[in-house]
Structures are given as C-alpha cells and as structure tokens.
Amino acid sequence: MKLATLCYIKKDGKTLMLHRTKKENDIHEGKWVGVGGKIEKGESPEECAIREVFEETGLKAEELKLRGLLTFPDFNNSEDWYGYLYVVEKFSGEIIESPEGDLKWVEDSKLFELDMWEGDELFMRWMMEDRMFSAKFVYDENEKMKDYSVTFYD
C-alpha cells in the first residue's frame, strides 16, 4: 500500500499543471497532472502536500483544502495507492523549474483539452465543483480505466 498526496494550485481562473516529461520509467510520462508525491515516514498528509508543492514548484502552500480521497487498487500491476487530494489557493513564492516536468498555468476552461488520466478528468470536475468525495478508480494493464465508484459528502 502506498500513501500519497495530490495538489492542484489555483489562481485567477487558472490551475498550475505539471506535464510529466523528465523522469525515466515514469508511469505518468506525457500526462498532465497536479503536483504531489508519496507520504514519507512520520509525515502527515498535509506536511507531505506542503513539502511536495515546494519541491516540485518552489511555491509555499499556505492553506490546503482537502477535496477528496482517492483509491487506485493494484495500480500499474503494483500496490494499491491511496491519495489525499488538495486544492491550494493561498501560496507564496516564485515558480522554479520542476525536476518532474514542465509547469504551466492552464485556463480552467482548457484543462480538459490536456492529455490526462481518465480518472483525473472525473475527479478534477468534482474538485472544481467544490465537492468533497471519496473515489476508487480501477485501471487495466493497458492504463485504461475499467471502472470507478464515488461517494460525495456534501
């Protein structure tokens, strides 16, 4: 079991997206995603999210809003992944060159034109509607979504 965080940083009707292009053997290669990563030993989800936002963007997240809990069973024929999904609207600092890929502010109206995971398209819509949810996304060996389920808490 892997625990992780995923953050979407928002400003002026735009979302900071990461185009994964720089890591070798990256399951997310070529996809547009939020920023985040694995929770380290002794770290809370919030501490992880703040650390990952800083490491990948150079920005200091000043306020996190929990929007969702994500479950990816047997992802990439590996372990189950569980994620905490946050929105960040209060932050400071300047964007750096990310070690993960290319960062770009994308108009919210253009987000779904990007190449992203099928499940991400679903949960980003819920996130943008300010809905709190718990969702499970099942992918096949070809990285296609086979099924999903969601519970809303609003």
Task: Give the role of each language-model region.
Residues 133-154:
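Acidic/histidine-enriched, glycine/proline-rich intrinsically disordered or flexible terminal extensions
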Residues 26-30, 79-82:
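A conserved beta-turn-beta hairpin within the catalytic core of GNAT-like acetyltransferases
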Residues 1-17, 35-38:
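Conserved N-terminal beta-strand and adjoining loop/helix that marks the start
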Residues 34-68, 86:
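The catalytic Nudix box helix
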Residues 8, 17, 83-87, 105:
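Conserved hydrophobic/aromatic beta-strand scaffold that supports enzyme active sites
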Residues 87, 96-127, 147-154:
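NUDIX/MutT-family hydrolases
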Residues 72-94, 125-127, 131:
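Active-site-adjacent beta-strand/loop module that shapes the phosphate/pyrophosphate-binding cleft
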